[in-house]
Regions:
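Hydrophobic transmembrane helix bundles of membrane-integrated enzymes that assemble
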Residues: 151-157, 184, 188, 192-197
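Interfacial loop-to-helix transition and helix-capping segments at the boundaries
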Residues: 27-38, 106-120, 124, 167-189, ...
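Extended low-complexity acidic/polar segments
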Residues: 180, 189-200, 209-218
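Alpha-helical transmembrane segments in multipass membrane proteins, preferentially the mid-helix core
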Residues: 129, 133, 192-203, 265-274
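Alpha-helical transmembrane segments of multi-pass integral membrane proteins
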Residues: 89, 187, 191-192, 216-342
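Membrane-cytosol interface segments of multi-pass membrane proteins
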Residues: 1-163, 170, 221, 287, ...
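Membrane-interface helix-boundary motifs at transmembrane edges
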Residues: 60-62, 136-149, 199-214, 275-284
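Juxtamembrane loop-transmembrane helix junctions in multi-pass integral membrane proteins
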Residues: 1-7, 27-30, 68, 173-176, ...
């Protein structure tokens, strides 16, 4: 499978982060859970879609397990630990009552305020190799005669277990001062989407020019419709047309609905590369900001705490916090996130040294 970057997916990730920040700043109420659902499904999709040919079989090797965990660790932990240390030093009362609490955060046994999202994602990455190994064993030893059609079985199994784990949680994690359901079902929905897109990409689509145009137009309209649903389904908009769902917090209670919308959006973004809506979500600015979205997510809450007294909730608070979050994320991406992520792939101190030398030393 060709590892070609799909810019439209960056637009999904950035929009998800915007929804989360918008809720935390009181700009768009109760839509943060929608953003979380988009992120989890997208993470599951990418785990399969860019995993190379037969990604489930690579985990037959213990070396691949270790490689995978090392890459994920260097991608996530340096930024996370830096953020935890920063919060603890300047604002220890926010979510850390003691050094023991800091240790629990470091090991993801506890996750205060917005860190619960990252806690969920880390556990999803811990489970991913096991899920892929089970699929690989099934495909290699039981479904081998089906060839590539065995991926339909993977899809059915992943969606079936996603539905099961939604109603019978695999486990609970302590995050944001309460026991949170482990949302691995959203991750599995994304994985199923990844297998579906892989299969469809392998097919020969001999479409006429007219059919291709119609398909692109339809995909653009579907993406626009999904985007509008994720935005306008906020209670702050619905109440203006006489629909009052305040207190129901539908995003958490019915996040599988938004997971399905995320699946639809992803499929359209993968197969549609033309049209104004697709180009809008895949524009270079969105791609750039999406790459920094991890830093934006980690540090926006710190700015939110500082801005509470100075700027009231709403549009101004959102714009100010988003701007400064982007500035912080930009700096940290260059000096920490990118080099550590690359180091996790190559484990080369030489390349790491060359990166920092090129960054700070001008010939």
């Amino acid at each position: 499978m060709e590892k070609k970057r799909l810019a439209g997916l960056d637009g999904i990730r950035l929009w998800a982060i915007i929804l989360i920040v918008a809720e935390h700043t009181g700009f768009i109420t109760e839509n943060g859970a929608v953003g979380v659902a988009l992120c989890f499904v997208l993470s599951g999709f990418l785990a399969v879609y860019i995993g190379g040919e037969h990604p489930e079989e690579k985990f037959f090797s213990l070396k691949k397990w270790i490689q995978y965990y090392v890459q994920r660790a260097f991608r996530i932990l340096p930024m996370y630990y830096f953020c935890i240390a920063f919060y603890f030093y300047f604002y220890p009362s926010i979510c850390f009552g003691s050094w023991d609490s800091v240790l629990r955060h470091f090991t993801f046994r506890e996750a205060g305020i917005h860190f619960w999202y990252l806690q969920q994602e880390v556990f999803m990455y811990l489970f991913l190799p096991l899920i892929m190994l089970i699929l690989g064993i099934l495909g290699h030893f039981v479904l081998k005669k089906l060839g590539d059609k065995k991926e339909w079985v993977y899809i059915v199994l992943l969606l079936g277990f996603a539905y099961y784990f939604k109603h019978h949680p695999l486990l609970h994690l302590y995050g944001n001062n309460s026991m949170q359901v482990f949302r691995i079902y959203l991750f599995m929905m994304g994985m199923a989407t990844g297998y579906f897109c892989r299969m469809m990409k392998r097919r020969e689509w001999n479409l006429s020019k007219g059919k291709a145009v119609v398909g692109n137009v339809a995909a653009n309209l579907v993406i626009l419709a999904v985007f509008l649903v994720t935005l306008l389904s906020s209670p702050m908009f619905l109440i203006k047309v006489g629909i009052d769902i305040r207190g129901q917090y539908y995003g958490v209670g019915h996040d599988m609905y938004f997971g399905v919308l995320a699946m639809v959006w992803i499929v359209c973004a993968v197969f549609c590369t033309a049209g104004p809506i697709v180009k809008f979500f895949g524009n270079p600015v969105f791609v750039h900001l999406s790459e920094r979205s991890f830093g934006i997510y980690l540090f926006h809450m710190l700015l939110r705490i500082n801005a509470t007294a100075a700027v009231p909730d709403g549009y101004k608070s959102f714009m100010i916090i988003m701007f400064f979050s982007i500035c912080i994320a930009e700096v940290l991406y260059v000096i920490l996130e990118k080099p550590m992520g690359d180091f996790g792939k190559h484990l080369s101190f030489k390349k790491l040294g060359q990166y920092y030398k090129g960054l700070f030393v001008r010939e």
